[in-house]
C-alpha cells in the first residue's frame, strides 16, 4: 500500500474517532447524566456540578467540531463536492458554530444567571433539597409569585438555558446526521 494511502486511512480513522467520541459525549451529557444528577443531587449542588462540567463539555464539543471540519475540508476538492460532502461540511460548520456560541457566550451567561437565582434562593433557605422530595406547596412557585426580582431572574436564567439547550440539540443532531451518513457509506461489516 502507498504511504499516502496509509495517511488517508489514518485521517479517516481520526475523523471517525473524533466524530463518534464527540457524539457519544453529547448523548451522555444531554440525555443521561443531566437527568440522573438532577434527580439525585440537591438543587444547588446540581447547579454547581453543571457549572463545572459545561464549560469543558462545550469547549470539547467545539474542539471536536473544529478538528472534524478541518479534516473534511482538507480532504475534498471544493469544486467537485458531492451533495453529501457539502452537507457534511455544512453540518460540521453548524456544529462548530453552535458549540462556539454555547462555549463562549451562552454558558457564561447561563451560569451567571444561575448564581444570581441561587443567591435569592439561599436567602430564603431554598436549594438544599433534592427535586421532587418536597411535600406540600411548591416553595419556588410561592417565591416567584411573591418576589418580582426572583421571577425576573428566573426568566433570565431559563431564556439562556433554553437557548443553550437548543444549540446543544443542534450539535447532537448535526453530529448524529454526519455519523449516519458515514454509516450508510460502509460497504460491509
From Swiss-Prot:
Its gene name is TMEM205
Looking at the keywords, is Plastid present?
no
The UniProt entry's sequence similarity note says: Belongs to the TMEM205 family.
What keywords does the record list, in alphabetical order?
Membrane, Transmembrane, Transmembrane helix
The listed locations are: Membrane
Report the domain of life of the source organism. Answer: Eukaryota
Major place of localization? membrane
Report how it sits in the membrane: Multi-pass membrane protein
Please give the Pfam families that the UniProt record associates with this protein.
Answer: DUF4149
- Coiled-coil residues are none
Transmembrane feature ranges: 18-38, 53-73, 81-101, 166-186
GO cellular component term, pick one: membrane
Q: What does this protein do?
A: In cancer cells, plays a role in resistance to the chemotherapeutic agent cisplatin.
Return the InterPro entries for the record. TMEM205 (IPR042623), TMEM205-like (IPR025423)
User: What is this protein identified as?
Assistant: Transmembrane protein 205
Amino acid at each position: 500500500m502507498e504511504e499516502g494511502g496509509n495517511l488517508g486511512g489514518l485521517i479517516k480513522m481520526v475523523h471517525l474517532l473524533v466524530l463518534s467520541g464527540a457524539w457519544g459525549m453529547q448523548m451522555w451529557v444531554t440525555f443521561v447524566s443531566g437527568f440522573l444528577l438532577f434527580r439525585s443531587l440537591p438543587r444547588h449542588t446540581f447547579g454547581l456540578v453543571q457549572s463545572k462540567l459545561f464549560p469543558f463539555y462545550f469547549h470539547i464539543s467545539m474542539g471536536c467540531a473544529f478538528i472534524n471540519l478541518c479534516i473534511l475540508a482538507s480532504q475534498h476538492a471544493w469544486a467537485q463536492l458531492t451533495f453529501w460532502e457539502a452537507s457534511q461540511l455544512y453540518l460540521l460548520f453548524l456544529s462548530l458554530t453552535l458549540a462556539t456560541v454555547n462555549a463562549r457566550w451562552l454558558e457564561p451567561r447561563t451560569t451567571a444567571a444561575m448564581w444570581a437565582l441561587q443567591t435569592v434562593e439561599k436567602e430564603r433557605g431554598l436549594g438544599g433539597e433534592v427535586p421532587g422530595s418536597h411535600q406540600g406547596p411548591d416553595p419556588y412557585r410561592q417565591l416567584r409569585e411573591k418576589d418580582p426580582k426572583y421571577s425576573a431572574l428566573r426568566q433570565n436564567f431559563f431564556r439562556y438555558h433554553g437557548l443553550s439547550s437548543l444549540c446543544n440539540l443542534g450539535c447532537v443532531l448535526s453530529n448524529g446526521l454526519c455519523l449516519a451518513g458515514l454509516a450508510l457509506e460502509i460497504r460491509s461489516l
